[in-house]
């Protein structure tokens, strides 16, 4: 699957806008477009989530982790682990979900 940036559809979940950039057999790549007013409450899903911060500043909480993330930082959250994401400064994050998040389609 190839998605040209001009063709990436804007979607929304928890009030956060995002684009699905690619869907493979077992994983998907999304670009999250966080606004300062966005908030991702504590939740869990059956997908492993790995992310890379392109821009912005965030507070990520999961397990015993409570970290501030900025451009260049990355993270991995195991499946079924409750986590939350507080937006401190607007920006973009690339997230990879394995398996594919059906609720994002």
Residues covered by each model-derived region:
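A cytosolic small-molecule/anion-sensing beta-strand core signal
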Residues: 54-55, 70, 89
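Glycine- and acidic-residue-biased ligand/ion/polar-headgroup-sensing regions
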Residues: 47-58
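A short, N-terminal "cap"/entry segment at the start of jelly-roll beta-barrel domains
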Residues: 1-26
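Conserved short histidine dyad/triad with adjacent acidic residue
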Residues: 30-44
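Ligand-binding loop in jelly-roll beta-barrel domains
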Residues: 79-103
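Short beta-strand segments in beta-sandwich/barrel cores
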Residues: 39-40, 56-61
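Short acidic-glycine-tyrosine-enriched beta hairpin
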Residues: 64-79
